[in-house]
Amino acid sequence: MKAVLITVALAVFLIFCGAFLKNNDSDWISLFDGKSLDNWKVGANASTFRVEDGMIVVNGATAHLFYEGDVMNHDFKNFEFKADVMTFPGANSGIYFHSVYQENGWPAKGYEVQVNNSHTDWRRTGSLYGVDDIKEVYVKDNEWFTEYIKVVGKKVVIKINDKIVVDYTEPDSVQQKVNIGGRRISDGTFALQGHDPKSKIYFKNIMVKPLPD
């Protein structure tokens, strides 16, 4: 009888764990429908961004594509974010978070997570640009990789293919290495960067998981 009770208890536990994991996975929300740039907004040089074969293709003059959709009213504070990315030789791009739409120029608000495996800028993919930069190249051009960002409170974790490359906590008194203005943990939306006409990058499976404040 005791063995039966243990078996039943174990089965219930496994079912509970399975349900928990399933719910956890289902918390991911897609920000890109794979067909259009609906819910995204770009100002100057809009032709830098287009959709092909379920991907956002970035190639053209300097521009930024901001998420302006209904998920969290495009205002994220604590979250997990991930996207599948492919770079081509010499390409430079970035993923901004805690940003806000602006018509042109480099985003004045938010942090940038670097996408760059072989551009002349030494700050490589996964760098928290100008704040916690990395020189190592963890992934190759012409291959898909997953870039992951998690923000909770003042803490930022960045992973490349599940490898932690940045684990940064913003101090109460921020002393940045470079003049990057509005780079502060706050809240806001995401943006994809079109860096220059020579850079070509693909993005797909752009997902977010909002986390409690």
Where are the regions that the model predicts?
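Positively charged n-region of N-terminal signal peptides that target proteins for export
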Residues: 1-5
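Bacterial N-terminal signal peptides
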Residues: 7-16
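Carbohydrate-interacting regions of secretory-pathway proteins
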Residues: 17-213
